[in-house]
Amino acid sequence: MDNAFVDKAKDVLAKDTSVVPEFWQKKYKNEANKNWDKFYNRNTTNFFKDRHWTDREFEELRPGHTFSEEKPVLLEVGCGVGNFIWPILERNPDIYIYACDFSPRAVDFVKTNENYTEARCKAFVCDITKDRLVDTIPPHSVDIVSAIFVFSALPPEKQAAAVANIVEILKPGGRVLLRDYGMYDLAQLRFKAGHKLEDNLYVRQDGTLSYYFSTERLHELFVRYGNLIELENEYVVKRLVNLKKSIDSERIFAQAKFQAPIDAGDIEAAMLGTKLSGGYGSAVPESYKTDGEESEILVD
């Protein structure tokens, strides 16, 4: 992502100075789960494609990736209708998945899917900003937490509470795998006036929220507030070109891995905000890589 694009994106965002009135800001934030429930009522299981790309991006999801002598346990937060779950269960026969969402309707779609069996998966309703995960999942029992386009649906002031909730069920050495919308993404730049609630937070026409992350914000949430160790934290860029429609723009995502401390040395490293020695890749806030995977876009 070159400087010319960044400057152009900043200029577009700087022109959007109007924000949604405070009454409506509070309403949209308080009714986030209600509006997503309506979304799934309208679209059922037909809106998103199954996410077959996740184990390519995150090696921890591949069969044979060893965390311990026990079979791996994964929690998918914001599971929706199961688009992440089904490909992973099919490819990784040893994994067990907990799956939660704050939309009761979405969880019902997961439970009624022909591939659902509680021998391998348990779906439940949970608002991770306020409902304790340990009420359903034993403390410090989960190897992997996946958060794929989830934190962007949460108001910024509630994101730290969600991180703290996740930390309670992570094993020592357990990992959070995250991919979400990044700052200056095409979807952010396409919002019209009247959709902005605050910096980087917007409301779609259907009332659902969308927050656009910087790598610095992710570091703040998971390292500063969550005391996790940063293994990766970068932007993933996909360029979109359509000469017929004169479109030349970029989808930008934030992708990161964080790890729960294993021992006192790791805890000290987490508190200092440093990366684990010998970890997976470098955590350079302004680094970018190109990704050819088809992406999802929700914008009006």
Language model features with spans:
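Core SAM-dependent methyltransferase catalytic element
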Residues: 239-300
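A short acidic, Gly/Pro-enriched loop at the edge of an enzyme's catalytic core
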Residues: 133-145
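C-terminal alpha-helical "lid/dimerization" subdomain adjacent to the S-adenosyl-L-methionine
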Residues: 182-242
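Class I SAM-dependent methyltransferase SAM/SAH-binding core
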Residues: 68, 72-133
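N-terminal auxiliary segments of SAM/dcSAM-dependent transferases
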Residues: 1-33, 38
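A short glycine-rich, Lys/Arg-flanked "PGG" loop and its adjoining helix->strand segment in the class I
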Residues: 160-175
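Conserved alpha-helix/loop element of class I SAM-dependent methyltransferases that forms part
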Residues: 47-71, 83, 87
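A short SAM/SAH-binding and catalytic strip from SAM-dependent methyltransferases
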Residues: 142-158
